């Protein structure tokens, strides 16, 4: 197949053997018997080891010896030839394969290549033009006619390929390819390709090939012509513009500027103003430009005295439209309703016959002609403007970066030196006073632009170290009490640390970080004239006439333009506002800025957190703010905070409003130094025991004007478990809300204004023996002498609680005598508390009584003992039924819901048999019961049967059912579903659902 002389597919000499052996063995062995098989089974201990060949070779050899033994014949079908001989390899015939000659491994190449290590000249299969003798590897010395790597046979179409360093004829289309370092012949289309280091192609930094726009490209450090628009850059160490040299450059690149010397003023960068030299009291910081991109030089104006433009679209003192970033230019607002400020524009209503109808619409403005309101809203939505404050960098005139206008900006700063700025709506901006006072003009107010870029304002250049948002400090020219680089996250300087390069200026104090960390030891947190207020609720008191606000809260300004009775309003829908005079203004993040009074300087107040967790154990300085001090947002008082002396302003109290409206404001009633918090409870303890309390007449002469003060004074109802069911009450007998006035309640309401003395609501009730006078002691106190053996208990407060009370009259001789005390006890109701305790308990609104409990209390007040003999008393539940107790019934202190329970078509009275009184007593007496929802229903159709034979059968069933339960049938109303029957005593009466027809 591959050049062999036989038909054997692998070129063997034998026809029948597949691998060229002389016998019919599988792998060229002479025979396949067991004696010659090296892998055949042999007995243990034979002389022939495993794998030894006694006969013919396994792979074509005549004899295969033991491993390592010499062989008598060549294995694998080869004759004993040396390595690299010309005898064919395994299975090869005399006729060579395609394109090869008769050579073993290492012989002549079959595809035109020479043998490895042989020097016999061979012919190329591709018809190359030259056939040189090629020495073996290592036979020729380096640098001979055919060095290492050179080939006598050139590439396709090439005349010859020179070796490394040899100049010879070049390749495709080239006249010659020079060696490494050659100087003449170039490649394809090239005029001249010089060697390495030749002068035709300049080296790096040479002057032949110039850069874009430059005359030549100088070497590193040379002083040749610069690039396009750039100034010549001097070499390192040369005198072109060395450090400290004040030489002006000829011209810079587009928007760039040359670096000025140390302290020298020079032409600034694109749009930035120049930096003056380093002098005492210089306006900017050391080596700092007063404006940034698009702020000063390019298309904006320098602001007035002391005011420095902000780099991020800030508002300065002068309103001018920037050329770069102006309206309908780069960075401007291209659409929406805020292209220009809204101005009321009158338009004629279209589509009406009458032209007198006019309306005002934003679409009528000249800037919005051809657009309706929906289109403007869509444009606003496309720009992400959904109302509220303006977004970052947005200006109402459509100005981009660097526009100085008179509208509020997010990153705006305020001008200095007695200029009235526009009221900023910036949540991140530093607040400045809205007006100047006549006593302390707020000049030298520093302006703090965006993201902590410090700019130093005007008069005498007194710089306050404004803390950067990203932790970078401002300038080197300030005299501050904190080190450079204070961050927003509360790093506090060491005590007495002062940076270098401190210059003139007065009262430079530190500004606080963004998130309100407190300064270190002995740091002054009360700033001077040039101090700005922090952002998020740091407790710093601003200077005279300076008001601080975070999110649009208008605090009380300084003396000149502030109304004494003005009301502060906030940006949160008046949730934090309170109408007060001379009160503190509560900031949303816990900063309280006291209003400045004409007769008192600003006092540092106590900081209040956003959620009312106030300071512990601090003493508030006397001020003319709210009487009880400032309260937290959620009406939590300052724990153990005692006002200092002098806090005795008598004025109308101002309750601090609650932002969520869930809890009423605290009443502040005091005319002298007393407690700070009234006796008011919140939560479950302040809930009334009943839904509809008894109408107790309260007509005090001196009471609190606050409604809450009067409401908590209402007495509560007691629960008497002695004569009720086993239900566990919510308020037990000992858990009533005491209505005893606390020590800080200066005005106590009186039950009866005609009384001769003021006494608490919970009066002392005692029982005295019949006809036994009780003399008064010398100190005017009554003795607690009791002779009838009644149970009594003395509480800690000295009050005696006994039952039943008796009416006590005072004689002229100063003794008290009991009139009408008997064994049963007569209930006297001289006060509303006693009447309330006699009323039956009815908590759920679904239950009702006839007469109502309010009517019972009114009749008991007029006629004592009325509740013991209520005629035809009715108790019921709406939608379930009612019970009419015949005759007179004693309803005093009954918990009706524990005794009477209505369910669907069922009523139970005294379910607990152990609590049931004998027949005729309590509610276990004759009564007429009416159950509702007793209707004759057809089970198949689900309709109500109103007449017919089926209704008569249903009525007969009700009569039979009443008789079975010991009741007497009275009537049945099929329309209303009322079943009325009479009982002599009470148990459980019901009608199940199985009695429907």
Curated annotation (Swiss-Prot):
Superkingdom of origin: Eukaryota
Residue ranges occupied by any Peptidase S59 domain in the UniProt entry: 844-986
Keyword Repeat recorded: yes
Keywords: mRNA transport, Nuclear pore complex, Nucleus, Protein transport, Repeat, Translocation, Transport
Localization of this protein: Nucleus, Nuclear pore complex
Ranges of biased composition (kind: Basic and acidic residues): 371-388, 760-771, 814-825
PANTHER family: NUCLEAR PORE COMPLEX PROTEIN NUP98-NUP96, NUCLEOPORIN
Protein name: Nuclear pore complex protein NUP98B
Upper lineage: Eukaryota, Viridiplantae, Streptophyta, Embryophyta, Tracheophyta
Primary gene name: NUP98B
């Amino acid at each position: 197949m591959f050049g062999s002389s036989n038909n054997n597919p692998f070129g063997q000499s034998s026809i029948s053997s597949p691998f060229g052996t002389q016998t019919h063995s599988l792998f060229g062995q002479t025979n396949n018997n067991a004696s010659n098989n090296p892998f055949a089974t042999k007995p243990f201990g034979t002389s022939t080891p495993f794998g030894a060949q006694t006969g013919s070779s396994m792979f074509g050899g005549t004899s295969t010896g033991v491993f390592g033994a010499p062989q008598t014949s060549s294995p694998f079908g080869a004759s004993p030839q040396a390595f690299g001989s010309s005898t064919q390899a395994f299975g090869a015939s005399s006729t060579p394969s395609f394109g090869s000659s008769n050579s073993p491994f290492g012989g002549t190449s079959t595809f035109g290549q020479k043998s490895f290590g042989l020097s016999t000249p061979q012919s190329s299969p591709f018809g190359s033009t030259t056939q040189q003798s090629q020495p073996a590897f290592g036979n020729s010395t380096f640098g001979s006619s055919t060095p290492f790597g050179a080939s006598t046979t050139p590439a396709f179409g090439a005349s010859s390929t020179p070796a490394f360093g040899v100049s010879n004829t070049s390749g495709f289309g080239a006249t010659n390819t020079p060696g490494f370092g050659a100087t003449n012949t170039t490649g394809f289309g090239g005029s001249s390709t010089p060697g390495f280091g030749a002068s035709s192609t300049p080296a790096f930094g040479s002057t032949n090939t110039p850069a874009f726009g430059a005359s030549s490209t100088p070497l590193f450090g040379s002083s040749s012509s610069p690039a396009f628009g750039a100034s010549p850059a001097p070499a390192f160490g040369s005198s072109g513009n060395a450090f400290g040299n004040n030489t002006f450059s000829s011209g810079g690149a587009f928007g760039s500027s040359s670096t000025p010397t140390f302290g020298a003023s020079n032409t600034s960068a694109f749009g930035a103003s120049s930096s003056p030299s380093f002098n005492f009291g210089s306006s900017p910081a050391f080596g700092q430009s007063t404006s940034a991109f698009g702020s000063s030089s390019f298309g904006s104006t320098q602001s007035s005295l002391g005011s420095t433009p902000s780099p991020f679209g800030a508002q300065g003192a002068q309103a001018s439209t920037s050329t770069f970033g102006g309206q309908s230019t780069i960075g401007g607002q291209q659409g929406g309703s805020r292209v220009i400020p809204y101005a009321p524009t009158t338009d004629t209503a279209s589509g009406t016959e009458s032209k007198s109808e006019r309306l005002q619409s934003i679409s009528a403005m000249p800037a919005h002609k051809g657009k309706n309101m929906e289109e403007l809203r869509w444009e606003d939505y496309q720009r992400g403007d959904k109302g509220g404050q303006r977004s970052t960098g947005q200006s109402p005139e459509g100005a981009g970066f660097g526009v100085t206008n008179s509208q509020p900006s997010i990153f705006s700063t305020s001008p200095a030196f007695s200029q009235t700025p526009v009221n900023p709506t910036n949540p991140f901006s530093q607040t400045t006073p809205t007006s100047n006072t006549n006593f302390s003009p707020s000049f030298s107010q520093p302006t703090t632009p965006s993201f902590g870029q410090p700019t130093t304002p005007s008069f005498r250049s007194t710089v306050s170290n404004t803390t950067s948002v990203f932790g970078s400090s401002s300038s080197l020219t300030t005299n501050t009490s904190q080190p450079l680089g204070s961050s927003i996250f509360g790093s506090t300087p060491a005590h007495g640390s002062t940076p270098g390069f401190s210059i003139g200026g007065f009262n430079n104090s530190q500004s606080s970080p963004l998130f309100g960390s407190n300064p270190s030891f002995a740091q002054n947190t009360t700033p001077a004239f040039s101090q700005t207020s922090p952002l998020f609720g740091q407790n710093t008191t601003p200077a005279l006439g300076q008001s601080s606000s975070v999110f649009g809260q208008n605090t009380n300004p300084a003396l000149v333009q502030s109304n004494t009775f003005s009301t502060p309003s906030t940006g949160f829908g008046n949730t934090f506002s309170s109408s007060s005079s001379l009160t503190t203004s509560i900031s949303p993040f816990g900063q309280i800025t006291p209003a400045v009074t004409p007769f008192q300087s600003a006092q540092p107040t106590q900081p209040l957190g956003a959620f009312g967790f106030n300071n512990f154990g601090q003493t508030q300085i006397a001020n003319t703010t709210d009487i009880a001090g400032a309260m937290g947002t959620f009406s939590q008082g300052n724990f153990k905070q005692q006002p200092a002396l002098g806090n005795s302003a008598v004025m109308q109290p101002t309750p601090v409003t609650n932002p969520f409206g869930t809890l009423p404001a605290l009443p502040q009633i005091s005319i002298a130094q007393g407690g700070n918090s009234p006796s008011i409870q919140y939560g479950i303890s302040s809930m009334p025991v009943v839904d509809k309390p008894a109408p107790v007449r309260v007509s005090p002469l001196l009471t609190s004007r606050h409604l809450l003060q009067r409401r908590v004074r209402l007495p509560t109802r007691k629960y008497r478990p002695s004569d009720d069911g086993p239900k566990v009450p919510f308020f037990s007998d000992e858990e009533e809300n005491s209505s005893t006035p606390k020590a800080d309640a200066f005005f106590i309401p009186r039950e009866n204004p005609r009384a001769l003395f003021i006494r608490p609501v919970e009066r002392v009730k005692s029982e005295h023996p019949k006809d036994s006078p009780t003399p008064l002691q010398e100190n005017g106190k009554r003795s607690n002498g009791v002779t009838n053996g009644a149970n009594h208990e003395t509480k800690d407060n000295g009050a005696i609680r006994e039952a039943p009370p008796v009416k006590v009259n005072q004689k002229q001789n100063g003794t008290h005598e009991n009139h009408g005390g008997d064994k049963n006890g007569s209930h006297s109701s001289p006060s509303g508390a006693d009447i309330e305790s006699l009323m039956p308990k009815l908590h759920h609104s679904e239950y009702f009584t006839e007469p109502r409990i309010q009517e019972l209390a009114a009749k008991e007040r007029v006629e004592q003992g009325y509740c013991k003999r209520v005629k035809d008393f009715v108790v019921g539940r709406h939608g379930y039924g009612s019970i009419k107790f015949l005759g007179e019934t004693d309803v005093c202190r009954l918990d009706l819901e524990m005794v009477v329970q209505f369910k669907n078509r069922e009523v139970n009275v005294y379910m607990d048999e152990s609590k049931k009184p004998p027949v005729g007593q309590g509610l276990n007496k004759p009564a007429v019961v009416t159950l509702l929802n007793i209707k004759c229903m057809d089970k198949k159709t689900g309709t109500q049967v109103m007449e017919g034979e089926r209704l008569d059968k249903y009525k007969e069933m009700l009569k039979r059912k009443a008789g079975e339960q010991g009741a007497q049938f009275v009537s049945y109303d099929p329309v209303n579903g009322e079943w009325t029957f009479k009982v002599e005593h009470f148990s459980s009466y019901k009608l199940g659902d199985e009695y429907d027809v």
